Amino acid sequence: GSTATLALTVANTGDKALPFSVGFHPYFAASKLDNVAFDIDAATCSESAKGEQPAAPETITLTRKEGSADSIRLMTGVKSPMRFTDSGNGHKVTVSFDESVFTNGVLWQQDAESFICMEPWNGWANSVNEAGHHIELNPGESKEFKWSVTIW
């Protein structure tokens, strides 16, 4: 397969603590949801980041609720790598990451079923406004977020 590695460094050049969270949003071609099988190990898995999080099932799936425009799975305690195989187009996708900086994962798909997002995150959307759900860097500190994707 072919592998691409990406890295983001967040540096606090200011004079007070910098709250932030990071999440990448890669899109991968997919034939349709029914053809995709995920291989993901996570502690929890739900459709919302709010409230108590249910334990992740042994097999994580991404299905569309009737009448919904998208499908989402928010996962905590995600282990590297996350993988999926698409029996419709023959693609195999692996997302590898450093578990010490990426603790969450997201699966997302919207509208036409021509793609799937399989995303390493360390927080949730708007987490800087929720205590305990983001990272803070002190002045002069920096943190690197590195991940890779391999496609066969």
Where is each model-derived feature located?
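Acidic, contiguous internal or C-terminal segments within carbohydrate-active enzymes
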Residues: 1-20, 24-25
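Hydrophobic residues positioned within well-ordered beta-strands of beta-sheet architectures
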Residues: 6, 22, 82, 93, ...
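Active-site/ligand-binding surface loops and adjacent short beta/alpha elements
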Residues: 17-19, 26-100
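Glycine-rich active-site loops that engage anionic ligands at enzyme catalytic sites
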Residues: 86-125
